[in-house]
Curated annotation (Swiss-Prot):
SUPFAM superfamilies: Kelch motif, POZ domain
Domain BACK: 135-236
Impact after mutating residue 34 to A: Abolished ubiquitination by the SCF(FBXL17) complex
Outcome of swapping residue 50 to A: Increased recognition and ubiquitination by the SCF(FBXL17) complex
Gene3D superfamilies: 1.25.40.420, Kelch-type beta propeller, Potassium Channel Kv1.1, Chain A
UniProt tissue specificity: Ubiquitously expressed. Highly expressed in testis and at lower levels in the submandibular salivary gland.
GO biological process: COPII vesicle coating; endoplasmic reticulum to Golgi vesicle-mediated transport; neural crest cell development; neural crest formation; proteasome-mediated ubiquitin-dependent protein catabolic process; protein monoubiquitination; Wnt signaling pathway
Protein name: Kelch-like protein 12
Start and end residues of each BTB domain: 33-100
InterPro entries, per the entry: BACK, BTB-kelch_protein, BTB/POZ_dom, Kelch-typ_b-propeller, Kelch_1, SKP1/BTB/POZ_sf
Amino acid sequence: MGGIMAPKDIMTNTHAKSILNSMNSLRKSNTLCDVTLRVEQKDFPAHRIVLAACSDYFCAMFTSELSEKGKPYVDIQGLTASTMEILLDFVYTETVHVTVENVQELLPAACLLQLKGVKQACCEFLESQLDPSNCLGIRDFAETHNCVDLMQAAEVFSQKHFPEVVQHEEFILLSQGEVEKLIKCDEIQVDSEEPVFEAVINWVKHAKKEREESLPNLLQYVRMPLLTPRYITDVIDAEPFIRCSLQCRDLVDEAKKFHLRPELRSQMQGPRTRARLGANEVLLVVGGFGSQQSPIDVVEKYDPKTQEWSFLPSITRKRRYVASVSLHDRIYVIGGYDGRSRLSSVECLDYTADEDGVWYSVAPMNVRRGLAGATTLGDMIYVSGGFDGSRRHTSMERYDPNIDQWSMLGDMQTAREGAGLVVASGVIYCLGGYDGLNILNSVEKYDPHTGHWTNVTPMATKRSGAGVALLNDHIYVVGGFDGTAHLSSVEAYNIRTDSWTTVTSMTTPRCYVGATVLRGRLYAIAGYDGNSLLSSIECYDPIIDSWEVVTSMGTQRCDAGVCVLREK
């Protein structure tokens, strides 16, 4: 070869792996092994240099003046033979097989032998398995073994899923101190203090004799002044544990005073009157009927923490009379009217795909629907009623995102467009609407276990195009049109007593209004007041039974889809 060739360092990608494979073959054939690890009377031949290179534990054992330094056999205590085999496989192959069955033995053993790679793999596996039923146990397990990242992940998970976590045995078996630590946390994500109070009562009831004296200490971390007066009088006052404790009664009286003496609230500020930080939730408003007198494709996002609006990518098809729900970090925009025909198509916003999200189409409904009601229950989306351009529907269908498929369910008793659909206590409620002849005040509910609809107590006012949302244990119905007037009135349905009450009216009449719950308050979004389209948004505080206008969108609209998304 002619010319001058400069020297060059060349590194192969397979050299280290090849050496590991060769050393593993030598181990399995007991060739050149210079130490035997003995665990539960089972011998594991190995190479000191390999063990020392992978583990600070073995490095210290074989390089210091410990008694094991020159011994051909080393007894390893505190782990099983099967676990030792998994760990040795990792040392020689870089691969570890972690399962639900072995992780509780594997992680402590990895900590003992200081195998950082195995410890990390176990922590990542446990984090992937976090669930409301096990997150508290995983948190304690992580703390015991100084797995800081896993402990923090489990703690955040328990805060994020607090209402579900407290339903499981791990919560009931916590010590008083552990319950205090959880419920005093600002970061637990609850729509109200109701699940916090109920969690404390259920924990005490599990072992009444031993725990009853702990109730006053725990109750001081429940932010009772932030509960509604109705809940305080109907639920808390009726609780025997509360009536029997003077200290508990004092805390209840403080909450009542907060409501009865608003002029004293500034003097009563403290940990119990401070709202929890809750989830980082944002409000999305999608499509609708805009100021150009036609359907629009504009999507706006409102962050209540910063009180700022921003635009997201537009939906692919302009729609009014549209329904919208959120499910598993995705927003679904369902049906509607594009100015020419009613739609069965459905678009989805994958909000986690990138900064602004990506819209794509999913399976269309079986029926074209504008002004349909939509809600979620479990992992499914339910859509009922609506108008297809020629008739109003009684039908309901359900979407399973796991298989991208819609299926028809039992029909409602009454055909409805412009009705509200909402879930409460595992039951779907459909409220009001228009049947083609009359505006309705009737309400029916669907039991997913039986597949049947039944009537419940009707609303006081006939309403079509009202906003509907669940807050605490009440279904709120806001605004709408009664056939002659655009409404500002609001009524609330108590799901426990099957009864309606009237609450304070909105500041503005709103028909074709969106309604949703954000950070423990009810929001009424945009709509039509009988003269003009609205961009304003008002917020209802159930604690003081009062509405206030909080912000305005950049776009005037009605008939829009509205939902809340929990940001990562």
